[in-house]
Structure formats: C-alpha cells, structure tokens
Amino acid sequence: MRRLTRRSAIASALALSACGREASSQTVTDTPLKSIATTPVGACVQHAFLQDPAYAELFARHYSQLTPEWEMKMEYILQDDGRFRFDRPDAIADFARRNGIRLYCTTMIWYDQAMPAFLKLDGQGKPFADAYRNYILAVAGRYRGQAVGWDVVNETVADNGTELRQSIWTRNLGVDEHMVLAFHHAKEADPNATLFINDYHLENNPTKRATFMRTVERLLKAGAPIGGIGTQSHLDLDFTRPGMARAAMRDLASFGLPIHVSELDISLGEKPDFARLADLRQRQADLTRELAESYMSLPQQQRFAFTVWGLRDQDSWLRGQSGQRPRDQGLPLDDAGQPKPMFQALAEVLSG
C-alpha cells in the first residue's frame, strides 16, 4: 500500500475541494496557500493596494511573507535634499506586524537608482562613502528586529550576461568593492537579517547565471557576509523551456546558502493566443511546478521563501509598469483574486 505523504494528502484534498466543478486542467482550489505550504510563501505589495480592505484581506489570507514592491527602494525613501521618507514603508511594515506576516525588504543598492542626494557627492571620495554607509545603516537599522531579510545588492549583472553593470556606485566605490561594503554595512545595521544578492534571468540565461555565480564567489572570498541567493524568476512562455528552472536551482544551491525565489511571475509571452488560454495556463503551471519542486528538493535550511511578484494579475508590473502587455496573466491569482492552475501547482508542491 502506498504511503500517504503530506503532499499526496494535500493533493487529494485539493481534488476533493473541486468536486462539483467542471473537471479540467484549470480546476483549482481556494484553500489559503499559507495554511498548506511548509515554507514561507510571499507576494509583493504596494502601499496604495493595502488601502483596499478586500486586497488586504486576500493578501493576509494566502501569504505569510510580504515584500514592498517599491516603497523601500531608494527612489522613494531618499529625497532630493538627503532627508529620509519612511511613511509608506512604515505603514507596510505595520500591516505585516499586525497580521503576523514576515517582512522582507528590497532593495538596498540598485544600479538603476542614482538619486540627486548622491549625485551631488559624485567623485568626492570620503563624503560619498560616508553617505553610502549612513543610508544603509539608517534604512536597514529602522527595520532591525522585524525584517527577516534584505536584497542588499540587486541586479548587478548586465543583460548581455557577461559583464557587471556600471553605475554611480561602481564609479565611486569600485565594481566589487561597493557590494562588499553594502553587505558589511547592512550586517552592521541588522545582524540577524539574512542578506541576499538578487538577480533576474538566472533561469533563462545560463551565461548570465555563470557570471552571477562567479561574482558571488568573488564577494564571498572578499569577506562579504552574503547570507542568501535570490533568483527573481521572471519567467516567460516565449523563452523559458522545461529544465531551465531545475538547472538554475541546482547551480545556485551549490553555494549552500538559503535560496529565495523572490519575484516569480510567468508571462504569457509577447503575442499570446488567448483562444488557447487554457493551454497557456497549463504551461505556466508546469513551469511553476518545476521551479517549486526544484526549490522543495533543497535541504530545509536552504529553503528561505517562495515569493510571487504581485497578488492578482491586475496588480502585476507586467501590465502596468512595462505597459507593453496589458492583458498578461502571469500570477497564481486572476484579476478577481481567484486561483489559477499556477496556484494549484504551488499548493500541491509547497505542501511538502
């Protein structure tokens, strides 16, 4: 007789919960994801979304961890005159605290954000370095004791996959040196938070993944207190093939550090055939299952969290921020907050 594992029991429960509906590849359940997942599960939020009680209730129903999508980035916190703005980050942190949700923070240092307060110090040596340290100490220190982790360095590898990005940080502090400093400053500010280096297209682009891994090796040898590896996992049906996620997880886990699937979504592609939406959603579910199974195959101490990049399809950057795919549907919950096949794949696999 086959042993009834937790995962098989959950799968059976999911199937039973769908009785009475039309049987299809799109049969899903509305069971709270966090109630059955054996790893922290999260999504990103924006302050404005949390003002909607229905949104806030749905988020708290399904997720045990949150990441502020925008308001903890430097472009929000650091004003032009050098003052800090913490109103919205504090409100998001308070929502997490009130609802027993883990707070994960992003992002400390990002090539894309050269704010006027730092541009004024460009090329000035010690004043620039002091401002860099003071910013990290102030921001990471503010959420000390609540934040479980930080994306300390974000998206350091260029899109060509072979080079590191150049920025105001590399120009003033050094290509590797600015990252080493950022990790040390963050560790000083919050010794108990897990400190991550985070990047995207690590599944789709093996060359970029290799460059990323060499960078991590150098930083570790230089003494950077890197505590974890973040893979954003912005996947795409046009480019992500079966096996890619599994290979990436195997490589990234080789450091022995905790892994955070930090920003999962799966785009339908540039020109999806919506007449075949059921098939497209099943392909999303298959990729989700592969990624989740690869993650769950890691030792427990390496499974930091599994995060999706948005609560509902209507909240996704794939539609709004990019503006190029207004009908994209890359998340486990649809526009109305109803589960899709991606959700069922997560529920079955993350149950352990």
Protein language model regions, located:
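N-terminal secretory signal peptides and thylakoid transit peptides that target proteins
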Residues: 1-17
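N-terminal substrate-binding region of glycoside hydrolase catalytic domains
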Residues: 35-90, 95, 101-102, 108-123
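Substrate-binding cleft and catalytic face of glycoside hydrolase catalytic domains
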Residues: 67-71, 90-172, 176-194, 200-202, ...
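Noncatalytic carbohydrate-binding groove/subsite architecture in carbohydrate-active enzymes
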Residues: 172-258, 262-270
